[in-house]
């Protein structure tokens, strides 16, 4: 059996410690929502500092096992810069490192393989602008064609070109991705996109859907609380989910 005990805690700044706890909470939230793929997929978070290091989950642990102290700090070549018993999944840092390095505001990057997200990613038409959730994402979703398992750094520039400045992406035949300046904001975007995919999967099973006019899409996106700083731009939602995690298991804070 693998030894899940962390290495002796490394000295980190109070700011990094806060970010580690928040990122570990996010992994537990994903586990609670069922947004897991065995030990695969990743949520990464840039660590403040000129080195531009970022935190990633240890490869081999389920999201429900991630804690603040066992998160691995790596550079953009995927090398651990602090001691860890666990390796890093090459497919994780290939996608995430490209986005962290290429988009200044991409402090957080999330990637999922949910059933609904992958189903829409496999659809020729992509995201249908026909429901309450997709209508809040007008002009915010990019598409990137499938090039195979993402272990080749050469895909990075093409991925960045596909994304441009859009905070969400559907990776064709693959899954969903979102990036943002914080965990709560990135989560809000990904949650909207995944929820839109869930509704699309259910509604299209019943026959043709009713598309929402573009002017209404624009209005919905402008009015969405998910992007409104007055309502936390996702912070209030993430705080509520963190409280749910706290009630169930505080071990993520270790």
Each model region followed by its residue ranges:
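Glycine-rich flexible loops
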Residues: 1-254
């Amino acid at each position: 059996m693998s030894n899940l005990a962390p290495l002796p805690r490394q000295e980190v700044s109070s700011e990094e410690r806060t970010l580690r706890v928040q990122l570990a909470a996010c992994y537990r939230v994903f586990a609670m929502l069922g947004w897991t793929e065995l030990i695969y997929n990743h949520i990464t978070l840039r660590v403040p500092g000129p080195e531009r290091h970022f935190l990633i989950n240890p490869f081999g642990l389920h999201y429900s096992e991630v804690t603040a102290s066992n998160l691995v700090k790596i550079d953009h070549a995927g090398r651990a810069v602090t001691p860890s018993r666990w390796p890093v999944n090459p497919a994780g840092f290939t996608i995430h490192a490209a986005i962290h390095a290429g988009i200044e505001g991409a402090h957080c990057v999330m990637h999922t393989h949910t059933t609904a997200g992958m189903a829409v990613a496999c659809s020729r038409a992509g995201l249908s602008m026909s429901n309450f959730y997709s209508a809040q994402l007008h002009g915010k979703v990019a598409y990137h064609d499938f090039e195979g398992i993402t272990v080749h750094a050469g895909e990075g520039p093409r991925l960045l070109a596909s994304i441009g400045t859009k905070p969400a992406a559907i990776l064709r035949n693959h899954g969903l991705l979102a990036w943002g300046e914080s965990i709560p904001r990135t989560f809000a975007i990904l949650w909207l996109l995944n929820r839109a995919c869930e509704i699309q999967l259910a509604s299209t099973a019943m026959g043709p859907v009713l598309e929402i006019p573009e002017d209404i899409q624009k209005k919905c996106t402008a009015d969405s609380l998910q992007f409104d700083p007055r309502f936390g731009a996702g912070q209030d939602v993430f705080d509520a989910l963190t409280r749910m995690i706290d009630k169930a298991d505080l071990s993520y804070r270790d």
